[in-house]
Amino acid sequence: MALWVTAVLALACLGGLAAPGPVPRSVSLPLTLKELIEELSNITQDQTPLCNGSMVWSVDLAAGGFCVALDSLTNISNCNAIYRTQRILHGLCNRKAPTTVSSLPDTKIEVAHFITKLLSYTKQLFRHGPF
């Protein structure tokens, strides 16, 4: 009988380990912005060339926010330094479906310069944001 109870308890414990996965934690906007600021600061402090000097479209962050920043960085490939930034931006972009851009950007800038602009925008939003 004791062996039977032990087996049932063991199966119950193993069943809990095989559960679908952890419940995603809800992260507030200020914490996510702070995480993005830390990531962008780390990227800008590194003195090595960022993404082999790749170029991205210069966008108006004040008008489009994090979604246009994500769109601009999406076409960069083989650049491990910005993967975490892209993931954070994806979480901050609250757009449900792709939208059409009314005016196409016509200027490209280096990724390093874009990251610096994004850092300034994020810091300003963190200080004066509506949360």
Curated annotation (Swiss-Prot):
GO MF annotations in UniProt: cytokine activity; cytokine receptor binding
Source organism phylogeny: Eukaryota, Metazoa, Chordata, Craniata, Vertebrata
Disulfide links within the chain: 51-79, 67-93
Cellular component, GO annotation: cytoplasm; external side of plasma membrane; extracellular space
Subcellular location, principal: secreted
Native species: Mus musculus (Mouse)
Pfam families: IL13
Function: Cytokine that plays important roles in allergic inflammation and immune response to parasite infection. Synergizes with IL2 in regulating interferon-gamma synthesis. Stimulates B-cell proliferation, and activation of eosinophils, basophils, and mast cells. Plays an important role in controlling IL33 activity by modulating the production of transmembrane and soluble forms of interleukin-1 receptor-like 1/IL1RL1.
Protein name, as recorded: Interleukin-13
Keyword Metal-binding: no
